[in-house]
Design a protein with these regions (language model features):
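Loop-to-helix entry region of an early transmembrane alpha helix in multi-pass inner-membrane enzymes
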Residues: 66, 70-74, 83-100, 134, ...
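Extracytoplasmic catalytic/substrate-binding loops of multi-pass membrane glycan-assembly enzymes
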Residues: 36-51, 62-75, 84-88, 143, ...
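Short helix- or helix-capping micro-motifs
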Residues: 25-26, 121-129, 133, 153, ...
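Transmembrane-helix motifs of polytopic, lipid-linked glycan transferases
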Residues: 92-112, 150, 317-321
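Membrane-lumen/periplasm interface segments of specific transmembrane helices
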Residues: 207-319
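Short acidic/glycine- and proline-prone juxtamembrane loop motifs at membrane-interface regions
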Residues: 68, 130-143, 354-355, 401-402
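Perimembrane helix-loop-helix junctions
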Residues: 1-11, 185-218, 222-223, 227-228, ...
Length: 444
């Protein structure tokens, strides 16, 4: 009871702006969604409802839901039947999930930085075209993303208790019921614990506390998939590979079409060189293009400055340099130059500058980050590690929509907000000091 009273007092003293932003977002999206967007604009919404009906009828073995388990169809058909309107049900799911993400974005960022940075980050979420789009449309994308964000709130807490680890596994599993991508967040978190948790006993204890609730919660889906389809996952990456790989030959495409229901290893061994060429193109150009907008003609982007190419990278990397508190040493400079030279030569020999320039952009930041890793807060460290692991895994396929990268997006507006609020004033101060110093020298 005392804890509840303390929580109420804390809420009263808390800044009301995050709640106000969330409420404004809710009513704007509600108005657009229910008064202007009055038909299924995407086939996915009605597809998941119909798929849910077929599952309830016992016809699941005849369904082909590539890239998604049965949770999405069951959610849509259950709420749709309850309300008597599949369209309204889908709208409610999207609206509540999108509003929840905007609300949580503040509190997750507050786990990382101060309230001002968290508030600006929340504003980036509230005005994001992708968040608004997913909150209005009837799709199966934003509900699993909401549960990922709930898990991220507990993951980024500075002090975690046993219930926190249990809840992380549980909410990632709920997301897994709707989309498989949450397993990447789980893998990243387990790797983070094993690398950065100092006490060996805690490493395994915390990992098991997260892993077991996840496995226990997803076990009905795995069992259903195995009984119905003869495999644990209904994911079909080869389908996306056949449709999306940039570099293809006619013979290769025909072979891929023949193995769309098989695993990635089969696709890899058809032509390893062609597979790797596409993989590194996805990893260093196509997928990051949806994060930062490399070219003028790309409109499907998560860049916080979507009008101009590349510019969205500047505040992100500026925020990263701010948290690492970089003081470049001669050794770091030597390693950086050497790495840049080696990668440049490798790109000239094996790659193309047009598609692999991001390696050269990232190299200095990787060197500085690893050299100053102790200065980076652990929860920020996790989000950076998650970004790397997510991109490495997801780049097996070319993402066809920018919103597929939203599970890792929070760190980008958060670092940008940090740069705008704390980094720029530091730069201004240093410029003033430099001008004053030069003025003093001229006077003498």
């Amino acid at each position: 009871m005392l804890d509840l009273k303390t929580a109420v007092i804390q809420f009263k003293n808390e800044n009301k702006m995050p709640i106000l932003i969330t409420i404004v977002f809710f009513f704007i999206i509600f108005y657009v969604s229910f008064f202007h967007n009055l038909t299924f604009g995407e086939p996915s919404g009605i597809f998941y409802y119909i798929a849910g009906e077929e599952i309830l009828k016992g016809n699941a073995e005849n369904l082909g839901i590539a890239g998604a388990p049965i949770g999405g169809p069951l959610l849509h058909v259950t709420l749709g039947n309850l309300l008597g309107d599949a369209f309204t049900a889908g709208k409610i799911i999207s609206l509540i999930s999108g509003t929840g993400i905007v609300f949580l974005s503040y509190f997750i960022t507050k786990n990382l930085f101060d309230k001002k940075v968290a508030l600006l980050t929340q504003l980036f979420f509230a005005v994001s075209a992708k968040i608004a789009f997913l909150s209005i449309m009837v799709l199966n994308e934003i509900a699993p993303l909401f549960f990922i964000f709930v898990a991220l709130y507990f993951i980024t807490k500075k002090q975690k208790t046993i219930p926190d680890f249990l809840l992380i596994g549980f909410f990632l599993a709920i997301s897994f019921w709707l989309r498989y991508q949450s397993v990447i967040i789980l893998i990243a978190f387990l790797i983070f614990l094993l690398i950065f948790e100092r006490k060996t006993i805690l490493k395994f204890k915390q990992s098991l506390l997260t892993f077991f609730p996840f496995v226990l919660t997803i076990s009905p889906i795995l069992l259903f998939n195995f009984i119905t389809f003869g495999k644990l996952s209904t994911n079909a990456p080869n389908l996306y590979i056949a449709a999306g790989f940039k570099f293809q030959t006619e013979q290769w495409h025909e072979k891929i079409e023949g193995i769309v229901n098989e695993g990635l290893i089969s696709a890899f061994f058809i032509d390893p060189n062609l597979f790797l060429k596409n993989y590194f193109y996805n990893l260093f150009f196509h997928n990051p293009d949806h994060l930062f907008k490399f070219t003028v003609d790309v409109f499907d982007t998560l860049s916080i400055i979507p009008v101009f190419p590349i510019l969205g990278m500047i505040p992100v990397f500026g925020g990263f340099l701010y948290i690492t508190k970089v003081r470049l040493t001669k050794l770091q400079f030597f390693i950086m130059i050497s790495a840049l030279l080696i990668f440049f030569l490798l790109i000239l020999v094996f790659g193309e500058i047009e598609y692999h320039f991001m390696i050269l952009v990232l190299t200095p930041f990787v060197v500085l980050g690893l050299s100053n890793i102790k200065k980076i807060p652990d929860n920020v460290k996790f989000l950076l590690l998650l970004t790397v692991i997510f991109m490495v895994v997801i780049s097996i396929i070319p993402v066809y929509r920018a919103y597929l990268l939203l599970p890792i997006w929070l760190i980008f507006p958060a670092l940008s907000s940090l740069f705008f609020i704390e980094g720029i004033p530091v730069i201004q101060t240093k410029i003033r000091q430099l001008i004053q110093r030069e003025g003093t020298k001229n006077e003498t």
